[in-house]
Regions:
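Short intrinsically disordered, low-complexity coil segments enriched in acidic
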Residues: 1-3, 33, 176-177
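N-terminal secretory signal peptides that target proteins for export/translocation
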Residues: 1-18
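Bacterial N-terminal signal peptides
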Residues: 16-33
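Residue-level micro-sites within transmembrane alpha helices that shape
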Residues: 22, 46, 112-113
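Residues at the start of alpha-helices and the adjacent loop-to-helix junctions
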Residues: 27-29, 42-44, 83, 127, ...
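Serine-esterase "nucleophile elbow" of acetyl-processing enzymes
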Residues: 36-84, 94-102
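Alpha-helical cap/lid subdomain in secreted, periplasmic
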Residues: 64, 71-74, 90-177
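Acidic-and-aromatic substrate-binding clefts and catalytic sites of carbohydrate-active enzymes
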Residues: 85-89
Length: 177
């Protein structure tokens, strides 16, 4: 199968974050819905994992993803719209000016800082829903990176948070990792 080979290639990139590997594996699938014959712009909207906090610029997720996609034959520019410490509320506040007319697809990797801060899952859901709606209004394919809550906030919080990503992916017809 091609997928294990893709995952092995992603692991060799040296960026050991689960979401980065899954994003890279799914990004080519995300771009498959867009005409690959012309230059494409893919925006990665996220937090420090997207931004590349603490890494040399060339070693971050976005430059590694762009290099990987280009090696696979995609004429793509991946725009780093990651902000260290960002929450879903921050992503929601930035989404309209992030999705410029030249954007062809979007990766959304937000929610980790919401978890760290114990933000109500209903607020995180509403923010992610607004981000996906903004992308949908522009007809953009989206890859939503799912997160799972640890159990330290209790079972009700965990259940509410864990349901956000699959529910919103189904509602908006997005790809989900």
């Amino acid at each position: 199968s091609v997928m294990p080979a893709i995952l092995r290639s992603c692991l060799r990139l040296g960026y050991g974050v689960r979401s980065a590997v899954l994003n890279a594996a799914a990004a080519f699938g995300l771009l498959a819905g867009v005409a690959l014959a012309e230059p494409l712009t893919l925006v990665a909207l996220g937090d420090s994992l997207t931004q590349g906090y603490g890494l040399p610029q060339a070693d971050g997720f976005v430059p590694q993803l762009e290099a990987w996609l280009r090696a696979k034959g995609a004429d793509v520019t991946v725009v780093n719209a990651g902000v260290s410490g960002d929450t879903t509320a921050g992503g929601r506040a930035r989404v309209d000016w992030t999705l410029t007319p030249d954007v062809d697809a979007l990766i959304v990797n937000l929610g980790g800082n919401d978890l760290l801060r114990g933000i109500d899952p209903a607020a995180s859901r509403a923010n992610l829903d607004a981000i996906l709606t903004a992308a949908g209004d522009r007809g953009l394919p989206v890859l939503l990176v799912a997160l799972r809550a640890p159990g330290n906030y209790g079972p009700a919080f965990k259940a509410a948070f864990d349901a956000i990503y699959p529910d919103l992916a189904a509602k908006h017809g997005t790809l989900l990792t």
